[in-house]
Amino acid sequence: MWLNLREKLQSKTVRIEHPEVYECKFCGSDQIMRYGKKTKQLKQRYYCKACKKTFVIDTITRRMWFDPKVVTMTLDLYYKGVSLRGIQDHLNQIFNVQLNSPQTILNWIKKYEELIGEYVKTLKPTLSGQWQVDEMKVKFKGNWKWLWNVMDRHTRYLLASNITKKREAEDARKILALAKEASKGQKPEKVVTDGLHAYKDAFNKEFFTLRKPRTEHISHIRLAGDMNNNLIERLHGTKRDREKVMRGLKTEETPIVPMQDIYYNYVRPHMSLEGRTPAEKAGVGVEDQNKWLGLVKKSLEASRRPVLDNPN
């Protein structure tokens, strides 16, 4: 499988495109020529015959140490299930990019989780009105904990994820509160959960009101029909597959879980959505073919701050 993936990536990703440059950034002359690439960074360098200076084109990603497509391809490979060392080997063989250690990739994940995470929090997805809530066990340094998820049924948009040590009412309430915050004031018509008693107390504290219309809590899951939790259980299956490659999460503060949610919402196409992402279905998707790069660009534009990828 890895060999097939490598061949596919080789044919698709070795051509790193660069924007056309027509004049020197220093003197404005059109007497410019391509002048190789910056060492290990795969960024196109240009030489001006008029002023004898070399330069690299300025773009929205001008402060990224490595070529943005290399960085975003690395993120994509990781969330498609390739191990850190597998990615390190791929970058070396295909792009001649030599990373000192796999930790560099984790540093990229942390850096871009912060950047992209801040951006997506500002977006308001258009939701269907039915939320599905569930929890699953995950491992942190050999200890089992609980990963909670809330998904909008029809868009498949993942509203919130949270990790807790226990599975009590306050833990259930926390995930519902996070989902309400992410919905930007959109009140669900129904909240579907399993029969865990903690959900009843949590739901009443977060959603109960005397005013109509009221949000309905559906906690008895039937084996068939519109109200079952099969969709979010499929999401858990996806996360378990990713966990096998991650070999257990390392700490609650890891950026891997938030980035996995970003990958699920904004990057990964869904067959049930006719090849669209949940974000596209919810009206907040990225149009770029390279979804990761599109997210980075939009995040940089929104934050107006540089991001460095210096591995040292």
Segments and roles (model prediction):
Residues 1-54, 58-60:
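Short, conserved DNA-binding cores of transcription-related domains
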Residues 33, 43-131, 135-141, 155-157:
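Short, positively charged, Gly/Tyr-enriched micro-motifs
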Residues 64-66, 111, 161-184:
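Active-site beta-loop-alpha junctions of metal-dependent nucleic acid enzymes
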Residues 143, 199-205:
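A short acidic (Asp/Glu
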Residues 143-149:
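Short glycine-rich loop/turn motifs
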Residues 187-199:
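Acidic/histidine-rich, metal-coordinating catalytic segments
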Residues 219-241:
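RNase H-like two-metal-ion nuclease catalytic core shared by retroviral integrases
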Residues 245-312:
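C-terminal domain-tail junction helix/linker
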